[in-house]
From Swiss-Prot:
Transmembrane stretches, start-end: 23-43, 78-98, 112-132, 143-163, 185-205, 209-229
Top-level lineage group: Eukaryota
Enzyme type, top EC level: transferase
The keyword Transferase belongs to this UniProt entry's keyword annotation: yes
Role of this protein: Involved in the fatty acid remodeling steps of GPI-anchor maturation where the unsaturated acyl chain at sn-2 of inositol phosphate is replaced by a saturated stearoyl chain. May catalyze the second step of the fatty acid remodeling, by reacylating a lyso-GPI intermediate at sn-2 of inositol phosphate by a saturated chain. The fatty acid remodeling steps is critical for the integration of GPI-APs into lipid rafts.
Sequence ranges on the Cytoplasmic membrane side: 1-22, 99-111, 164-184, 230-252
Keyword Cytoplasm annotated: no
GN (gene name): pgap2
Keywords assigned: Golgi apparatus, GPI-anchor biosynthesis, Membrane, Transferase, Transmembrane, Transmembrane helix
Protein's UniProt name: Acyltransferase PGAP2
Organism lineage: Eukaryota, Metazoa, Chordata, Craniata, Vertebrata
Segments on the Lumenal side according to the record's topology features: 44-77, 133-142, 206-208
EC number: 2.3.-.-
Length: 252
């Protein structure tokens, strides 16, 4: 990556603002998620809102919406597949971004690598729960979902810790804005996730009408806050370009 500037070099073959690349990558699962929810409500309402105890429910769970019926399953898998490789590239970019930030803490370099590892694990288990739906193999899908949530929480926590340790209130306006939104979205994500667990337990214990609808809505907020957290890359890479150059140009 190089800073955005008027000169791109004679050997530059392709360039793209990294903000466009990073946010566009996250937009793929966002589109797929919204499509699956809307399509399920319009065309597969009864199939995707059914509950094990047959109480009234008005929203499909995330698993039912993305993996229960077609074409939702195909759209979700296509978008997740397309966004996966770029997500790993964004992870590498973040690793270099954090490593390039001066910090006197002896634990900082290890936190950078831990953050990258957690990010890779999050992406891997997202792929697993995507391509093994709950209707195909419930146990594997459940494992993928639980691991995805665990690594997502870990990644967000370590990311916020890196910013707190390295920045300590300093940095540009964009960096301070990014850090502020990261903290808000992580807190909201954690609150919605814990709330969804409590509501899910309540549903399984008492099977009351509408409770599973609340659970599904909380799931949606968990997913959207996760995507929002990753979209803070808009501020982190605002002055960078992704460039592909011929061998004569050493910039990448």
């Amino acid at each position: 990556m190089v800073p955005v500037g008027p000169e791109r070099g004679a050997n530059s073959l392709f360039s793209l603002r990294f903000t466009t690349f990073a946010v566009g990558t996250v937009s793929l699962p966002l589109f797929a998620f919204l499509f699956c929810i809307v399509w399920s409500l319009l065309f597969n309402f009864s199939e995707t809102t059914a509950t094990h105890c047959h109480v009234p429910n008005y929203l499909p769970s995330v698993s039912a919406a993305i993996g229960g019926e077609t074409p939702q399953r195909y759209i979700w898998r296509l978008c997740i597949g397309l966004h996966s490789a770029p997500r790993f590239l964004v992870g590498v970019a973040y690793l270099h971004y954090y490593q390039g930030t001066p910090c006197s803490s002896p634990a900082y370099p290890r936190l950078c690598h831990l953050n990258f590892l957690l990010n890779c694990c999050e992406i891997f288990f997202l792929i697993l729960l995507t391509y093994v739906s709950s209707s195909e193999n419930y146990e594997v899908h459940k494992l993928g979902f639980m691991a995805f949530m665990l690594f997502s929480v870990g990644y967000m926590f370590v990311t916020c810790s890196l910013w707190r340790v390295a920045r300590k209130g300093s940095g540009s306006l964009e960096e301070r804005t990014s850090y502020a939104w990261k903290k808000r979205l992580f807190g909201f994500y954690l609150l919605m996730f814990l709330s969804s667990i409590l509501v899910y337990i309540w549903h399984n214990m008492y099977c009351e009408a509408g409770v599973y609808t609340v659970f599904a809505l909380l799931e949606y907020l968990v997913v959207l806050s996760n995507m929002g957290f990753h979209m803070t890359a808009w501020w982190d890479f605002g002055n960078k370009e992704l460039m592909i150059c011929s061998p004569g140009d050493k910039r990448i």
